[in-house]
Amino acid sequence: MFLRVIDFFQLHLRWYSVGLIFFSFIPIYYSIIVCQPQQFKIDGFELINPVFNKHHSTRSCTSATKSLQNGLIALFIFYALKIYKKVYLIVLYIILIIHFGFEIRNAKSETSRKYIAISTREMFMYYVELLLLYFQNLLLLPYICGGYFLIRHVHRIPSKEEVDRQTLKFKEEARRIKRLMIEEDWHVKEANEDVKNKIEQEGLKRKDMEFEEQLYHLRIEKVKRREQVLKQKLEEKKAKRRQNAERRKKRREIAMEQREQ
């Protein structure tokens, strides 16, 4: 399970880590805040450590220790940002929050510490030391805020097998959609053909009905003509029969007259 961080948070936190490392390891900065050695010379210019050490048997400065811690934390976070597992990022983030809480507690204890028999200059440098200490604690806040958004805006990068599986799934889905579209087109085409056939059948039915109606009228006319022809023939036959009957009647009359004579 690989995780990839959004480039915005990752890039800015890495640049911030580089800046914090550079700030924590400036030699002149350490010559001022580090209690050992007591004096530091650069090109004949002597820098005397302003922080009083007569009340500390360890001869150590809190701000110097804190600066070293910040530098190491920045270096560790710079390389830890290459981790893409969300569980590891959450664990490191919790450790950072716990460390920040302990540093705040140490800063409060350093503030509540009381010194006696110190000069005004030493008191002034004491407050400068506290100011540096709080400032160095505040330098961890971007990691806390950025780490929160870093963990929140983590999205997953699938493995090669999952990509292949997802690609295969997409291809199968594309084939299925294409097949459904072809079937839908076929159904639409079939429905259009059915509608067209129905329209053609209705047109043919109408034509058949018109043709049958025309045939019916033609048959009626033909029957009427036959009836007329039959009537004419009957009338002609009747007329011939009448003529024949009249002829026979005349012949009989002529024959009877001849017999009487």
UniProtKB/Swiss-Prot annotation:
The keyword Zinc does not apply. Keywords: Membrane, Transmembrane, Transmembrane helix. It is a multi-pass membrane protein. Residues 234-261 are annotated as: Disordered. Residues 234-246 have a biased composition (Basic and acidic residues). It is found in: Membrane. GO terms for cellular component: membrane. The chain crosses the membrane at residues 15-35, 87-107, 131-151. It comes from the Eukaryota. This is Uncharacterized protein F07F6.2. It comes from Caenorhabditis elegans.
